[in-house]
Amino acid sequence: TNINDKSISEIESLSRELKISAGSYAGLDIALWDWKAKKANMPLHALLGLPIPKTKTSLTIGIMSPESVIDRVPLLFDNSTAKYLKIKLGSPEGIDADKIMYEQVLESSKPYNLGLRVDANGGWNTENAKHMIEWLSKRQCDYVEQPLAQGKEKDLKTLYENRLLPIFVDESCRYSQDIIEYSQWVDGVNLKLMKSGGITEGLRVLATAKAFGLETMIGCMSESSISISAAASISGHIDHIDLDSHYNLKPDPASGAKMVNGVTMPRIAPGHGAFLTNENQI
């Protein structure tokens, strides 16, 4: 069947019938939206009726030793206009190791005047999560993401009561229907196109979150400028941005979204604006 004869929503429905994985379909969905915007000779954000992003992105630091933090933070921010740092916690060595690392991040980030946020990647149990949220609330942390493991969503209710920081979910929210189950137990959701199956479902996730009065975030996995540019193209109304993985790729096989005054900005061109720099690398 000619792709022109089918809408993106029809192709999405077919992919679900065929049980195509979210990550695989995300690549196709992004390509379809890019094609549709190019056909209209419009930037993708404009085709979708969205503004260009204005919210500054965070850069991310993984679980590491305090000594590594001392080197890593300046490496990230000495020549960057980013103003937020996301710290991965949930160390297998326990919350004492998390505290030691966070304290070093707090110290090392002072010269850059950064906003700090924490992603526990589901690495805490309910008791430790409650303790860490209280501890972090006294140490300049803006919010905590995915404090509990995927599958432990019912325990979010206990954690949400009397929380001292906003709670976001990431792995616990893949599709828009997930939000309905625990919208009363979280403050926000983190959308990732590779996790949700691309732009089509991603827009549903954002709309559903906003309908329930939740804050929105968009993040990424280890992705190139292709999918980051697509994510940046839909981030104009999103509250928190975490689109930084392409800055770490050496080399990035594509070119597109760049940091402009701390904002991960899509290249303004028809489509999502990204292109392969050398197809032989793929």
Question: Where are these predicted regions, by residue range?
Answer:
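Metal- or metallocofactor-binding catalytic centers and their adjacent structured scaffolds
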Residues: T1-A40
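Generic secondary-structure signature for well-ordered alpha-helical cores
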Residues: N2, D78, E107-K110, A211-L214, ...
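Conserved, mostly hydrophobic/aromatic
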Residues: L28, N41, L85, D119, ...
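Predominant activation on well-ordered alpha-helical scaffold segments within soluble catalytic domains
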Residues: D29, W33-D34, H45, E103, ...
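N-terminal amphipathic alpha-helix/helix-capping segment at the start of soluble metabolic enzymes
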Residues: A37-K38, M42-K54, G262-T264
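Metal-dependent enolase-superfamily TIM-barrel catalytic cores that perform enediolate-based chemistry
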Residues: A46-R163
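Catalytic alpha/beta core domains of metabolic enzymes, predominantly
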Residues: G151-D244
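Flexible C-terminal active-site loop/helix
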Residues: M221-I282
